[in-house]
Regions:
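Short beta-strand boundary microenvironments
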Residues: 114-157
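Short cytosolic juxtamembrane segments of multi-pass membrane proteins
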Residues: 370-383
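Hydrophobic alpha-helical transmembrane segments of multi-pass inner-membrane transport and secretion
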Residues: 15-42, 252-287, 310-319, 362
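Hydrophobic alpha-helical transmembrane segments
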Residues: 4, 18-22, 322-323, 346-354
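Hydrophobic, regular-secondary-structure patches
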Residues: 26, 30-114, 135-137, 200, ...
Length: 383
């Protein structure tokens, strides 16, 4: 077997080509890991948002989008008095009548951006139990409460969404009264407004939905039966987890686009690496002949060349790991209903290492085999 140190020396003898191959491997591994992290983060964020005990009551025909839903006022009281399996807190049912509205928010300096605005009452904190008020308090009339990551979704500076700052919505100036989080969900990129205020600002008479927290998941059947029995109310009950699972399915093509872009760019980098390896190995044909002449067969030389190219792939992976840990880890990526945070898990890092290794093997095999095909006399006579 050819010594491992021989492979290292060959890489050091051609630092320019080695750096080129390592950089190409780094780019490919980085693209693959970023695509994997985006897929995982978006899917996990949408999955975390749904509570298995929560049910969303929407208008019939609006199961795909709460924003398009219309639910009559008073439905929450009717449900609270008709269903026995609703969780009670302080002898009151956990029912949150809400309006979900996509609208433009502006800062005082005129910068505008579209936000997901949720009109709620205090009881929303009972229903959405992941929500925690970090600073300030729940909004009173003329005030709003913003999510911890709302500035990422809106593209504003963090300082513009601090307590006491003013945002403009539909010509009304609203004072930020609090900041909340809901770790790992899309909620923490939202803006919450008192329900009655939002109905006034948007001139709406109906709700978007009613979110109900049940004592246990099996109580959903009673709630579902109620909506089917009361045809006059035109309601549909959908479990919150199912709603966000459908949203995740809706965004699946976007997640696939990330993979497709990473794949196409990786193919380009792979061909560039193949070209560099062909040039590198072709200039060493005489060296391969000399190694065969002293007793090493072609298979051992082939293995040595694959090890050599695999080393560049693994070094590229290590560089990609460094970029991921120092720069990309924790970056927030906005999308239409919120933001997700890139998280490079151990599985994703293992995928990156495997990609670098496979890239080295696949990239090194064709040029190595092409250079080892000539007979020993032809190899020794090669210029």
């Amino acid at each position: 077997m050819i010594p491992f140190s021989h492979c290292i020396r060959n890489l050091l003898r051609r630092p320019g080509q080695s750096c080129q191959l390592i950089a190409g491997s780094c780019v490919v591994v980085l693209l693959v890991m970023t695509a994997a992290s985006m897929n995982h983060a978006m899917k996990q964020t949408l999955g975390n948002t749904g509570d298995p005990l929560n049910t969303i009551i929407v208008g019939a025909g609006s199961e795909e989008s709460v924003e398009r839903s219309e639910v009559k006022q008073g439905v929450a009281e009717i449900i609270g008095s008709s269903i026995s399996g609703i969780r009670q807190i302080m002898d009151k049912p956990s029912l949150s009548p809400e309006i979900h509205f996509n609208g433009m928010l502006s800062t005082q300096d005129g910068k505008s951006s579209q936000a997901l605005i949720r009109g709620v009452q205090h009881v929303a904190l009972w229903v959405h139990q992941r929500v925690r008020i970090l600073e300030g308090r729940f909004p009173n009339p003329g005030e709003i409460m913003v999510g911890r990551l709302a500035h990422k979704k809106l593209g504003f500076n963090r300082s513009q969404l601090q307590i006491g700052q003013i945002l403009v919505f539909n010509g009304e100036e609203l004072i930020i009264s609090g900041i909340f989080d809901a770790i790992g969900t899309v909620l923490e990129a939202e803006v919450w407004v008192p329900l009655q205020d939002l109905m006034t600002y948007t001139q709406r008479e109906n709700l978007s939905c009613v979110v109900v927290t049940l004592d246990e998941a099996r109580s959903f059947g009673d709630l579902d039966a109620f909506t089917k029995r009361r045809l006059d109310l035109e309601l549909v009950a959908i479990q919150e987890t199912e709603y966000y699972t459908k949203l995740s399915t809706f965004y699946k093509p976007i997640r696939w686009m990330a993979w497709i872009c990473a794949f196409l760019l990786s193919i380009g980098a792979l061909f560039g690496g193949l070209n560099a390896l062909y040039a590198s190995f072709s200039s060493r044909i005489q060296e391969f002949g000399a190694i065969q002449a002293i007793g090493f067969n072609r298979w051992k030389i082939l293995f040595s060349l694959i090890v050599e190219s695999s080393i560049t792939g693994l070094i590229g992976s290590l560089l990609a790991f460094g970029i991921v840990v120092l720069i990309l880890q924790g970056i927030t990526v906005p999308f239409s209903i919120g933001v997700f945070v890139l998280n490079f898990t151990q599985i994703i890092l293992a995928l990156g290492a495997g990609t670098g290794l496979v890239l080295g093997v696949i990239g090194g095999l064709p040029p190595a085999w092409n250079c080892l095909r000539p007979s020993l006399p032809e190899t020794l006579r090669a210029a």
